[in-house]
UniProtKB/Swiss-Prot annotation:
<comment type="similarity">
    <text>Belongs to the class-II aminoacyl-tRNA synthetase family.</text>
</comment>
<protein>
    <recommendedName>
        <fullName>Threonine--tRNA ligase</fullName>
        <ecNumber>6.1.1.3</ecNumber>
    </recommendedName>
</protein>
<dbReference type="Pfam" id="PF08915">
    <property type="entry name" value="tRNA-Thr_ED"/>
</dbReference>
<dbReference type="GO" id="GO:0005524">
    <property type="term" value="F:ATP binding"/>
</dbReference>
<dbReference type="GO" id="GO:0006435">
    <property type="term" value="P:threonyl-tRNA aminoacylation"/>
</dbReference>
<keyword id="KW-0479">Metal-binding</keyword>
<feature type="binding site">
    <location>
        <position position="345"/>
    </location>
    <ligand>
        <name>Zn(2+)</name>
    </ligand>
</feature>
<feature type="binding site">
    <location>
        <position position="469"/>
    </location>
    <ligand>
        <name>Zn(2+)</name>
    </ligand>
</feature>
<dbReference type="GO" id="GO:0005737">
    <property type="term" value="C:cytoplasm"/>
</dbReference>
<feature type="region of interest" description="Catalytic">
    <location>
        <begin position="201"/>
        <end position="500"/>
    </location>
</feature>
<keyword id="KW-0963">Cytoplasm</keyword>
<dbReference type="InterPro" id="IPR004154">
    <property type="entry name" value="Anticodon-bd"/>
</dbReference>
<dbReference type="InterPro" id="IPR036621">
    <property type="entry name" value="Anticodon-bd_dom_sf"/>
</dbReference>
<keyword id="KW-0067">ATP-binding</keyword>
<dbReference type="InterPro" id="IPR047246">
    <property type="entry name" value="ThrRS_anticodon"/>
</dbReference>
<dbReference type="InterPro" id="IPR006195">
    <property type="entry name" value="aa-tRNA-synth_II"/>
</dbReference>
<dbReference type="InterPro" id="IPR015011">
    <property type="entry name" value="Threonyl-tRNA_syn_edit_dom_arc"/>
</dbReference>
Length: 619
């Protein structure tokens, strides 16, 4: 089912002419008007025929939640086939609409426009941030769905914007001028619509740059990585791993699949909001991991450690983790079914220690994203917590907002539905106004008990630790998506897109003017000892320079007769120049710039042949 929910000053309709699918309705039901109403435009879909009752229950819950949030006491149900291209049978649609009307009438004044009629309608939308929302109702796809995911769908959220200093206001009362990206993020979060309606710009870029592509021979959401893409991904993996180890984590490795009937794991599955891949093997029901929690917690159960080891951190870069995301939500690198997740868990002695570690990991995540190429202005912050936690720790929450020095989205629950009491995410909002979570940390108050994890305190007594879940960058693939989308927006505004020099597959391209300059070009490549290639193709210099620009090469150096005689290179620096502005520099000066821009970052060799004439084309 697809829902478009509009909070209106009024909505009125008149049924003009029946189609061959029109339901029979009395004359007085062929027109109607509601003032101060929430209008639900509805398309009942083919998928809904599998379980109409479940669809009605979930749709009623969504409509009721929005109606309460906007304080609407009247609801208009309006059949609107244009919301979907996969409509149900007319019989199912009428049944669902009637049952939905009956369900909502217990709490609201409800009117319903008849199904299958040509109708005219007039509506005046109120125009506040919550006045236009959409919902997609999906009841299963054959995957294993956790109890927590079902709870998440029912959880009632209290949304606020927290300003620096701690003031909280409802989104509809916040002045978003100067915070337009935050406004888009707020709408995306409240609407909860993850379906893909347009292809984001990074999909064209990841293919044109020969980084990543779809793999038609696999399940949707599983990608192939070309040499350049594998290089970028590998560098990010190494960097995030290095940062986790610098934080004091011990690197471990755990299995990718687990027994679904394991008593402890079964309980945890029902507390984690995710859809799992389920497989059968040797009469066992197995599932593929969606994080490193399972293996690290089982390892923690078997460990012996004391308060002297706290905070104790374990880290794994899971290649891969798996989530059976809904097919309509999969696109490019934004949302995948197989992904690489840096996953660190920290055992803390008490809540005070956990909160201090949370703050440190919050700040470390800001640093990780900054070094990868995303500044605070490039993403929005969401902080989510239970009401009890907030009441007891207001100053701490306000301090998190002060660190980022900008308004953040707050989601508060009256009760705890999940295993955590506090979490944050840094969310990237792309050119299509879709948001994706990157870095995150959660304070877990359940799983030490569930997995029987304990440490020995100073008095020799066994205690349960508080556990932090931390991904300093979020999934590596999603970080690549955010970097590409950021550059797409820069290009759309007239800028020159490029990856940071340390992530660029080719850091320097040498362009010989003629064949007699090839030897010097190769010599320069060897002297620089970075990721340097040589465009030895039989093309004009102008064409070679344009191609280097299309590949986002940070430094392009031309070698001709003048360069042979002076020993200097004519270099275009992409970050500060145009093709009409050249800089003369020596090999040593160029190498010094490269060293400065890549200091403290991982390094990999050029992933392709040095000579462009020897390279295969992947796309």
């Amino acid at each position: 089912m697809q829902l478009l929910l509009i909070h209106s000053d009024f909505i009125e309709f008149e049924a003009k002419k029946p189609t061959k699918f029109a339901e029979e309705v009395p004359e007085e039901a062929r027109s109607g008007r509601l003032d101060e109403a929430l209008c639900a435009f509805i398309a009942v879909e083919k998928f809904d025929e599998d379980d109409p009752d479940a669809v009605v229950a979930q749709a009623a819950g969504e409509i009721e939640e929005v109606a309460k949030r906007v304080k609407a006491e009247r609801i208009m149900l309006y059949p609107y086939a244009h919301l979907s291209s996969a409509l149900s049978s007319p019989e199912t649609a009428v049944r669902v609409l009637r049952d939905l009307e009956s369900t909502l009438k217990s709490s609201f004044e409800v009117a319903r426009a008849p199904f299958g009629w040509y109708k005219s309608f007039t509506i005046r939308c109120k125009g506040h941030p919550l006045s236009e929302l959409s919902r997609s109702i999906r009841i299963g796809e054959g995957e294993v769905v956790s109890q927590a995911l079902k709870s998440e769908a029912k959880a009632v959220s209290h949304w606020r914007i927290m300003k620096k200093g701690g003031e909280m206001v409802p989104p509809e009362e916040f002045d978003f001028r100067g915070h337009e990206r935050l406004e888009k993020f707020v709408r995306y979060e409240i609407e909860k619509s993850r379906a893909v309606d347009r292809i984001p710009p990074h999909v064209e870029l990841m293919r044109r740059l020969e980084l990543v592509d779809y793999e038609p021979g696999s399940d949707p959401g599983n990608m192939r990585y070309y040499p350049k893409g594998r290089l970028v991904k590998s560098l990010l993996e190494s960097y995030v791993t290095d940062r986790a180890l610098e934080m004091g984590a011990m690197e471990v490795e755990t299995p990718v699949m687990y027994d679904m009937d394991h008593p402890t794991l079964k309980k945890y599955l029902d507390r984690f909001p995710a859809r799992q891949y389920a497989i059968e093997a040797d009469k066992k029901h197995l599932f593929l991991r969606f994080a490193a929690c399972f293996g690290q917690f089982l390892m923690g159960h078997d460990m012996t450690f004391s308060y002297r080891s706290l905070p104790l951190r374990m880290f794994e870069l899971t290649r891969y983790s798996f989530r059976r995301e809904q097919r309509g939500e999969l696109v490019g690198l934004r949302r995948l079914r197989a992904f690489t997740m840096p996953d660190m868990h920290t055992f803390c002695g008490d809540m005070s220690s956990a909160m201090e570690e949370f703050r440190k990991q919050y700040e470390a995540s800001i640093s990780v994203l900054r070094d990868a190429g995303l500044d605070l202005k490039d993403y929005e912050v969401a902080i989510r917590f239970t009401k009890d936690f907030y009441e007891n720790n207001k100053t701490f929450i306000e301090g998190l907002v002060d660190i980022v020095d900008k308004p953040v989205l707050i989601e508060m629950w009256d009760e705890r539905f999940f295993y955590f009491v506090l979490k944050f995410e840094f969310n990237f909002v792309d050119a299509l106004d879709k948001a994706s979570a990157l870095s995150t940390v959660q304070i877990d108050v359940e799983n030490a008990e569930r997995y029987d994890i304990g440490y020995v305190d100073a008095e020799g007594n066994r205690q349960r630790p508080i556990i932090l879940h931390c991904s300093p960058s979020g999934a590596i693939e999603r970080l690549m998506y955010a970097l590409l989308e950021k550059q797409a927006m820069i290009a759309a505004n007239g800028g020159l897109p490029m990856l940071p020099t340390w992530l660029s597959p080719t850091q320097v391209r040498i362009i010989p003017v003629a064949e007699r300059h090839h030897a010097r070009a190769m010599e320069v490549a060897e002297q620089l000892n970075f990721r340097v290639d040589v465009d030895d193709r039989d093309e004009t210099v102008g064409k070679k320079i344009r191609d280097a620009g299309r590949e986002w090469v940070p430094y392009v150096a031309v070698v001709g007769d003048e360069e042979l005689s002076t020993g200097l290179l004519t270099v275009t620096v992409r970050s500060e120049s145009t093709s009409n502005q050249k800089i003369k520099m020596s090999v040593e000066e160029l190498r010094a710039r490269l060293q400065s821009e890549t200091a403290g970052r991982p390094w990999r060799r050029l992933p392709l042949p040095v000579r462009l004439s020897e390279r295969p084309k992947f796309v």
